[in-house]
């Protein structure tokens, strides 16, 4: 058996960073949607609960339907709770939530990218590229692996394999950062160095060997 290559002292324990987008880099402001829900007598979070039910969200994450068609699915899910007009307003408000990028996270990732490839790996709609452009982040990563473009949704092992291949790095030499425990566990099971993101400090600690 061929021994694993010896790595120089001080070299980082990974050769690529694979990073989620939503709730790591990008954060949404739901206050407008919450106000609409209150105005029509719905409990806060009802629209999101309907929208992100697996059977409703999966088609848009796989790129099989557009965000606008997703709104129609949300309207169907809200039937009986509010009027059709109100349901459409709620669905539209959800897909148009304002968002921002976390400057600290972006800065950390840009610094890391000077040392190793950076790949964004995200469950997203076909709107992702336009959203990254709106945030001024089209050039943030070397590659973007979006579920809607590749037809694979985390935690499917194949999306991690694809991301590592895009980076040109073995799975066990990748750092993976995500805010969803299920995705972190799936990545770890494949041998990736997986980090469950809660705040920017988690990312800074994980990237410390590069910074």
Residue ranges and their predicted role:
Residues 37-75:
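Alpha-helical substrate-recognition element adjacent to the catalytic core
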Residues 2-52:
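Active-site neighborhood of HAD-like aspartate-dependent phosphohydrolases
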Residues 1-15, 19, 125-211:
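Asp-based, Mg2+/Mn2+-dependent phosphohydrolase catalytic module
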Residues 29, 102, 124-125, 180:
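Helix N-cap/beta->alpha junction signal
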Residues 40-51, 79-92, 171, 211:
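Short, surface-exposed acidic
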Residues 60-103:
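Metal-dependent phosphoesterase signature
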Residues 85-119, 157, 200:
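Short, acidic loop-to-helix structural element flanking the phosphoryl-transfer center
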